[in-house]
């Protein structure tokens, strides 16, 4: 672990942050689309 050089560690941290941000953004988009679809169906059934 300590033998790892700094460039690898920095790249790993950057990749981890990018993946985390992308996952949160994708989940938010999925949630909004799901919310819109459910609202549309509720409006149709009302």
Swiss-Prot record:
It is found in: Mitochondrion. This is Putative uncharacterized protein Q0092, mitochondrial. Keywords: Mitochondrion. Its main location: mitochondrion. It comes from the Eukaryota. One of its GO terms (cellular component) is mitochondrion. It comes from Saccharomyces cerevisiae (strain ATCC 204508 / S288c).
């Amino acid at each position: 672990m300590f033998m790892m050089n700094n460039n690898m560690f920095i790249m790993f941290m950057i990749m981890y942050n990018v993946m985390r941000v992308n996952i949160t953004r994708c989940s938010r988009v999925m949630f909004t689309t799901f919310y819109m679809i459910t609202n549309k169906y509720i409006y149709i059934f009302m």
